[in-house]
């Protein structure tokens, strides 16, 4: 079983289930709208035009200005899928971003990115993926419109070309 192409579809299925809970709750829908539709709009907007955003660094409290991209959002959404309690913040973060307020989204994306960069799990993950699943890391048209799109598969396939096998 090659797992290379399951990331995008699985994330979209999990998001659909999670965000449908908000859409089906009158109180959540009244406050947050349709988080799935808003997420798609935010991603499309950021793919076309990444936006400079000033946010507060969660570790230092320092204000930093960087450009937020669709990849920041997709990466954050992907990791929140593994943390359902924290994932409850997604509708609020998506709502803010849909209104052009990206600071909280960027702060959390950068915090998550920093945590991942400091962990050893990426090396272990790539060792397994590159040994067992590299052949299944192919771009698929049906993943193009998902939250992750094909960027993750392209990135992992590229890393696997140089990754030691064994």
Language model regions located:
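A catalytic-pocket lid/entrance helix-loop region that shapes and gates access to the active site
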Residues: 2-41, 95-102, 107-116
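Alpha/beta-hydrolase fold active-site neighborhood
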Residues: 38-166
């Amino acid at each position: 079983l090659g797992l290379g192409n399951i990331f995008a579809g699985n994330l979209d299925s999990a998001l659909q289930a999670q965000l449908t809970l908000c859409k089906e709750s009158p109180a959540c829908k009244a406050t947050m709208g349709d988080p799935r539709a808003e997420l798609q709009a935010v991603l499309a907007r950021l793919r076309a035009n990444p936006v400079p955003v000033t946010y507060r660094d969660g570790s230092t409290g320092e204000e930093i200005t960087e450009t937020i991209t669709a990849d920041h959002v997709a990466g954050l959404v992907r990791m929140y899928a593994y943390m359902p309690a924290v994932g409850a913040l997604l509708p609020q973060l998506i709502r803010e971003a849909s209104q052009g307020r990206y600071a909280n989204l960027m702060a959390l994306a950068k915090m998550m990115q920093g945590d991942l960069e400091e962990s050893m799990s990426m090396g272990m993950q790539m060792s397994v993926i590159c040994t067992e699943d590299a052949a299944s890391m192919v771009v698929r048209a049906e993943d193009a419109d998902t939250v992750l799109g094909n960027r993750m598969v392209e990135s992992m396939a590229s890393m696997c070309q140089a990754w030691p096998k064994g």
